[in-house]
């Protein structure tokens, strides 16, 4: 029984093993078949994809070839059009050249015909000239026989007569032209000057060489003088100004030719009086502060002057020098006010003449800038001013106008002459500058004495406040030519021996009277 069970188990195991083996073989075979089918499908799909890519590449290549072919065809057509256009242009040019050639040929024929005609006329003219020369020679021979002169002698006499007549007529014409030009120029100049003078109406107050400072009481004079005069000596030493105390009640007079120093002294004295502490150390401190304040005021005055004149872009150092001109005088005329006046006159006259108004105003404003430092630098103030203008970058025309306004250099530009004229107008107008009566009388006497010293002078009159001198000469001793030379000599001697503002007109008068009696 147990054996049978074991046998059954063994048989079952064998059958199970066989069945498992067969089942394994079946499963393995199925897997291999599936793998083969999968491989075939992959290969087929790869082949199809390769065929598709091949077709796509072929299509792209065909499209690219087609596009390139189309571009080449378009380019070929464009070249063909250009060549046809060029051919048409060449044909047109050829036709034009043929027309020009035909015209040139026609003109050549015409020129040849004209040359032939000219040659014929030249031959005819030569024949006529020969005949004319023969007749002229015959006439000359007859004239020589009749007049008793050779042809050369007659020609020389005729030339002398023609030359004399021509010289006389040309001299007369030149005198007329010069007279008309001089009259026109004088009239125009007077109109321009009169217009400028009438249009300018600036205020003017004569400058003094003293300044008065009012004191609160007479006792203040003793405090200003100080013990043994130490305060007044310290103030005079610090400012360079003379203090006059005893002349006027409750007033101190500051005397100095420098308005700048007088202004510093006035500011310092007023501040000391207000402060009440007056001693040498305090005086020096106050004077130093007043000098610093005045420097600021000087710059402000210069800036205001450029604003009033309408001139811009001036170097700051020149503006400071302009401010210093406020404290300079010339014949009691304030130099800054004079410069503003010259600037305005230059602008007005430049407008009348069609010149640059801004440049004229600038030259007029800066023309006396050298007076701000002429006490520190040697030389004429005009040349000093020109050097200053050159140093700070002013234009050549401005520099020359400054240098030439007193003829330290000969004026070479219209602007220089314009500044000269405006400077003379500002300084020479009545009341602009003051002179002492004795100096004025002496100058007139010197003028008359200079002219009287020349030979042939009978009477001399200095008129127009010494700005014109009229000289009467003896007509029997001095002729017209000598009158002209005498006028030049008197003017030259006045320039050499006298110093004066502006200019002096010299007029020499020669009068000849003829008296007859009818009986």
UniProtKB/Swiss-Prot annotation:
It comes from the Bacteria. The chain crosses the membrane at residues 3-23. One of its GO terms (cellular component) is plasma membrane. It is a single-pass membrane protein. InterPro entries: ATP_synth_B-like_membr_sf, HD/PDEase_dom, HD_domain, HDIG_dom, KH_dom, KH_dom_type_1, KH_dom_type_1_sf, Ribonuclease_Y. Keywords: Cell membrane, Endonuclease, Hydrolase, Membrane, Nuclease, RNA-binding, Transmembrane, Transmembrane helix. Belongs to the RNase Y family. Endoribonuclease that initiates mRNA decay. This is Ribonuclease Y. It comes from Nitratidesulfovibrio vulgaris (strain ATCC 29579 / DSM 644 / CCUG 34227 / NCIMB 8303 / VKM B-1760 / Hildenborough) (Desulfovibrio vulgaris).
């Amino acid at each position: 029984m147990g054996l049978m069970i074991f046998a059954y188990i063994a048989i079952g195991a064998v059958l199970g093993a066989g069945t498992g083996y067969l089942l394994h073989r079946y499963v393995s075979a199925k897997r291999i078949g599936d793998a083969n089918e999968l491989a075939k499908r992959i290969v087929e799909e790869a082949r199809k994809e390769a065929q598709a890519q091949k077709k796509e590449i072929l299509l792209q290549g065909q499209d690219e070839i087609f596009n390139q072919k189309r571009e080449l065809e378009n380019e070929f057509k464009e070249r063909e059009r250009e060549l046809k256009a060029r051919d048409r242009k060449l044909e047109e040019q050829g036709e034009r050249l043929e027309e020009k050639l035909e015209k040139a040929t026609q003109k050549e024929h015409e020129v040849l015909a004209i040359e032939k005609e000219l040659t014929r006329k030249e031959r005819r003219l030569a024949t006529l000239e020969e005949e004319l020369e023969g007749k002229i020679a015959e006439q000359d021979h007859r004239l020589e026989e009749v007049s008793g002169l050779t042809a050369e002698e007659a020609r020389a006499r005729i030339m002398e007569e023609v030359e004399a007549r021509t010289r006389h007529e040309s001299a007369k014409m030149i005198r007329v032209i010069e007279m008309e030009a001089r009259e026109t120029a004088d009239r125009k100049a007077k109109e321009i000057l009169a217009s400028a003078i009438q249009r300018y109406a600036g205020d003017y107050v004569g400058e003094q060489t003293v300044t008065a400072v009012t004191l609160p009481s007479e006792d203040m004079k003793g405090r200003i003088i100080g013990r043994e005069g130490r305060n007044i000596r310290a103030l005079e030493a610090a400012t360079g100004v003379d203090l006059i105390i005893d002349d006027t009640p409750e007033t101190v007079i500051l005397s100095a030719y420098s308005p700048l120093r007088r202004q510093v002294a006035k500011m310092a004295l007023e501040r000391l009086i207000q402060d009440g502490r007056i001693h040498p150390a305090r005086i020096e401190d106050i004077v130093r502060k007043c000098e610093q304040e005045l420097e600021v005021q000087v710059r402000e005055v210069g800036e205001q002057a450029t604003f009033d004149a309408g001139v811009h872009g001036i170097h700051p150092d020149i503006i400071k020098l302009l401010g210093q001109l406020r404290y300079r005088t010339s014949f009691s005329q304030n130099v800054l006010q004079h410069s503003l006046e010259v600037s305005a006159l230059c602008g007005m006259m430049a407008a009348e003449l069609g010149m640059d108004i801004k440049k004229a105003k600038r030259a007029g404003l800066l023309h006396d800038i050298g007076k701000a430092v002429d006490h520190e630098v040697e030389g004429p103030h005009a040349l000093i001013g020109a050097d200053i203008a050159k140093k700070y970058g002013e234009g050549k025309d401005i520099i020359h106008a400054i240098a030439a306004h007193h003829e330290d250099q000969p004026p070479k530009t219209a602007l220089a002459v314009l500044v000269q004229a405006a400077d003379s107008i500002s300084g020479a107008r009545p009341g602009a500058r003051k002179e002492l009566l004795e100096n004025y009388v002496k100058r007139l006497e010197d003028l008359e004495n200079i002219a009287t010293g020349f030979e042939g002078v009978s009477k001399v009159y200095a008129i127009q406040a010494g700005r014109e001198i009229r000289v009467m000469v003896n007509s029997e001793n001095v002729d017209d030519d000598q009158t002209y030379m005498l006028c030049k000599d008197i003017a030259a001697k006045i320039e050499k021996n006298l110093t004066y503002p502006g200019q002096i007109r010299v007029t020499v008068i020669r009068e000849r009277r003829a008296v007859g009696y009818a009986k």
